[in-house]
């Protein structure tokens, strides 16, 4: 199997490390990532995520995100609503929509066709993966960024339905939904990136 993650993140007071929370900003971020392994120049085997696409709901995040990272952020419309125990997140411009039940429940069944035997096994693929990678084709360099997270507790949720037009552009053969988790209140920062 190969695994692709669609991460939807509501940030709070996002700012460069060392800056006061007062100047932080709240953004909604969407990341499309593929699970990878990379052997660095020292011979160390690193597990992480390779960036396929990144989106945000604010131009400010696109501007500064593309200065400080190689995540290639684009701004899109993002709509969120909660009604009758169901969260809906969608974008007309980006062509995605998903609906999940708000209740976190260990007894939620895995999605049909999931390659995992149970949620315990599925959690091993819910991170946190320490590294994020981007590749610069022109310079043939890999940027490696290590993220540091605390309180990472993935809780299973039931995904009612979903559609992401971007995933269709990847032309994957018979993709299946492997799992769906929600993770809340994560203190998070990135270490300075390294280029190889």
What are these regions (language model features)?
Residues 1-32:
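Glycine/small-residue-rich interface belts in oligomeric ring/scaffold proteins
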């Amino acid at each position: 199997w190969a695994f692709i993650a669609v991460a939807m993140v509501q940030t709070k007071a996002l700012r460069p490390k060392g800056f006061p929370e007062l100047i932080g900003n709240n953004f909604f971020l969407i990341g499309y990532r593929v699970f990878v392994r990379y052997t660095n120049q020292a011979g160390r085997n690193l597990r992480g995520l390779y960036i396929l696409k990144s989106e945000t709901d604010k131009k400010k995040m696109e501007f500064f995100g593309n200065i400080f990272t190689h995540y290639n952020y684009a701004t899109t419309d993002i709509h969120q609503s909660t009604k009758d125990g169901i969260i809906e997140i969608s974008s007309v411009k980006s062509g995605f929509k998903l609906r999940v039940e708000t209740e976190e429940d260990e007894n939620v069944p895995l999605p049909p066709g999931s390659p995992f035997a149970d949620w315990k096994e599925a959690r091993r693929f819910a991170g946190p993966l320490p590294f994020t990678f981007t590749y610069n084709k022109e310079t043939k360099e890999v940027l490696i960024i290590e993220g540091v997270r605390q309180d990472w507790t993935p809780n299973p949720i039931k995904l009612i339905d979903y559609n992401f037009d971007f995933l269709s552009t990847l032309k994957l053969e018979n993709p299946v939904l492997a799992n769906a988790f929600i993770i809340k209140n994560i203190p998070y920062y990135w270490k300075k990136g390294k280029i190889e």
